[in-house]
Amino acid sequence: YNRLLELDKKGIDAKFIDENIYKSFVSSKTREWNDFALLCLVLVIGVPYVFSPEYKNGMINLIRTTENGKTKLFFGKIVVECIYLLIAFTALYVPYFVRFINTYGANSLNTPLVCIFENVQETSFSVINAVVVNLICYFLLATAVTFVITAVSIFTRSSMFTMVVSTVLVILPLLALYSIENVRIGYWVVNSHIIAIVMTCLLSILIAIVTLEISKLKFTETRIWRRINAKA
């Protein structure tokens, strides 16, 4: 109560709010990793089949503009992956958001985080701001995961093998990080939402670059193999 009075004197619209309500929505280690791991699992199951019709049709030509290339088809399939990602992300996160509002009401979303956490520097940053930043960060990470699965799919040309490799590369690391308290988007958002966004963007860009390099190496390998066969 004394803290709320202090905040009120500073011109902050202080409110009582159950800390558990906020933690259950954006700062719950269990819910964060469970939801994101479930989303990644859905991606691992669905994304490999986007390119599967091309595994036996010179799929590697899809990723470069050559005389035999199919750039339009490649980017069309990328759009399909993005739509699949958006549907999966919405289906997983929106229902929880709706349940939260139905249970606690929308007013609690406007509560400044300084009413809950004393170490928050920006007094205007509210629960809804934290929720939005949290969702943006997870969507960027999910996009990066989609790039990883696509790269594995291009490299292996096998849906089932892609699922196995993607599980090792994505799902298992998530399970390994589960017990580390500070490795959570919600933790970063509370301490510095700018750092959370920047770090997530950098990680996503890095993964995208690695994906493109994998496709480049695979294309070069295939081109060399075809030249050798042509000479033979």
Write out the residue ranges for each language-model feature.
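Secretory targeting signals
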Residues: 3-54, 74-155, 159, 193-200
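Terminal transmembrane helical anchor/hairpin motif
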Residues: 105-133, 160-232
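Short helix-to-coil transition segments within interhelical loops
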Residues: 64-70
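Intrinsic structural disorder
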Residues: 1, 38, 48, 56, ...
